[in-house]
Amino acid sequence: MDAKQSVAAAKPSLAKKTASASFRLRNGSLNAVRLRRVFDLFDRNGDGEITVDELAQALDALGLVADRDGLAATVSAYVPEGAAGLRFEDFDALHRALGDALFGSLDGAAAAGEPGGGGGDEEEEMREAFKVFDVDGDGFISASELQEVLKKLGLPEAGSLATVREMICNVDRNSDGRVDFGEFKSMMQGITVWGP
């Protein structure tokens, strides 16, 4: 196994994962706002379309490995004829289809009395998300690690270490200047939106 393959093997993968239902937003209008922000971040050149290359780059920046051919096949089903990539409406349709496939439909989950349908080990999903931010693997997210991830995502908050430190302070319950897994988990559970 060469170095590139070993790095890819160490990264979380999108293949054959069941996602945690707790990460699915249930409030339609809030979901649309967040989805638009994600779309704009992924649309690196600002042309109003997300190409397979842009999507692959965004997933790679998040530390996720996606099979390029599988990604292209999935995305192409939602790209309108004559378009180079996904427009926001297409991205929204893809997001809804993936959400239904991973979590079950919102109607079906509500009818079954489950808060998201589908299973998945929520703790393991949280740990995988934590690892994206814990760049050095020491079990903590420092301000510099958070800043590094925000830069990779192209977020403006990455420009100021003071802003990033403030973000850390908002989550850091024991005031050690870092975010441990317990603090990260509490923060992630706190931002989950369960709509009607």
UniProtKB/Swiss-Prot annotation:
Residues binding Ca(2+) 1 are 43, 45, 47, 49, 54
Has keyword Zinc? no
The residues that hold Ca(2+) 2 are 134, 136, 138, 145
**Disulfide bridge partners, by residue number:** none
| Record-given protein name | Probable calcium-binding protein CML32
Identify the residues that the record assigns to the EF-hand domain, covering every copy: 30-65, 121-156, 159-194
Q: Name one GO molecular function term.
A: calcium ion binding
Q: Where does Ca(2+) 3 bind?
A: 172, 174, 176, 178, 183
Identify the keywords attached in UniProt to this record, alphabetized.
Calcium, Metal-binding, Repeat
Check the record and name the InterPro entries matching this protein.
Answer: EF-hand-dom_pair, EF_Hand_1_Ca_BS, EF_hand_dom, EF_hand_pair_protein_CML-like
One short Pfam name that applies is EF-hand_6
Gene, per the UniProt record: CML32
- Function (record text): Potential calcium sensor.
